[in-house]
Amino acid sequence: MQNPFVPQLVYIEPRALEYPLGQELQDKFENMGIEIRETTSHNQVRNIPGKNHLQQYRNAKSTLVIGVRKTLKFDSSKPSAEYAIPFATGCMGHCHYCYLQTTMGSKPYIRTYVNVEEILDQADKYMKERAPEFTRFEASCTSDIVGIDHLTHTLKRAIEHFGQSDLGKLRFVTKFHHVDHLLDAKHNGKTRFRFSINADYVIKNFEPGTSPLDKRIEAAVKVAKAGYPLGFIVAPIYIHEGWEEGYRHLFEKLDAALPQDVRHDITFELIQHRFTKPAKRVIEKNYPKTKLELDEEKRRYKWGRYGIGKYIYQKDEEHALREALESYIDTFFPNAKIEYFT
């Protein structure tokens, strides 16, 4: 995806128009000539066009729903943060392996919430509860928030809010390069801006509808030069023919692009490919021609939260992946911090 996301269809909850952002977005999309429909609830969007499941799925991915977030209880977001902060749900990307395939289920449309101040007030309450500890908030658990922020500027508002806080830190990750409007945000070093990166094979075969790797790396350089703490998530680390060379090439590219003066505070998060049985069913339905390897027989089973287990690589494969990636990071980014491998 080279151009910033523009929805083909917009739904608005009437209550959203009681908030300035809701009104602003309605005006914006009217001026752009985009069809706007009313929906009673952002959870009950019906009549998305399409003759069959695949058409409806693809159309849903280019549909934006403007709503009010009613649930202000934040979920946990370990290991990346204490809490997930819910500014948006859903994503315009088509990553075959994404866990949102199952958590979003029958609602793959993108939702943005306009009661931003209420969400930030709730974050402040969580910070007070945990004082004097720092509290980290993850803004990309259920969406790629950067992908829609050129339209909403919600993320920019949040970055500046956390920039003024004493005990709050914001984090998010993106596969999009449309970051220019965020470069002048007053972040005060309180927001870690992370990019999802991967071997060429994975991006080419499993990440349609996202920015190319070179564009992500270019954006990462801009972000680092704007003074943001920078991070990279390598996920999913995926075994494929020539994977050792593929991942080495990724780190060589990153090393060639990142200036030395922005390397003093870089983090890496490493996540091996995993899938659940329900995810496999949904992935094969939504992307019937995918090359993604989803063979339970080749994997080992690991129990997860809520009793839903996942299939991950065998111990020897996991060890090889971890050893290879950690050695590349050690070679090219010896001062970086590896936050976790999972």
Curated annotation (Swiss-Prot):
Catalytic activity line of the entry: (5R)-5,6-dihydro-5-(thymidin-7-yl)thymidine in DNA = a thymidine dimer in DNA
- The residues covered by the Radical SAM core domain are 77-305
Q: Which cofactor does it need?
A: [4Fe-4S] cluster; S-adenosyl-L-methionine
CC cofactor note: Binds 1 [4Fe-4S] cluster per subunit. The cluster is coordinated with 3 cysteines and an exchangeable S-adenosyl-L-methionine.
Q: Which InterPro entries match?
A: rSAM (IPR007197), SPL (IPR049539), SPL_Bacilli (IPR034560), SPL_firmicutes (IPR023897)
| Family under the similarity heading | Belongs to the radical SAM superfamily. SPL family.
Q: Which PANTHER family match?
A: SPORE PHOTOPRODUCT LYASE, SPORE PHOTOPRODUCT LYASE-RELATED
Subunit details: Monomer or homodimer.
**Which protein is depicted?**
Spore photoproduct lyase
The gene coding this protein: splB
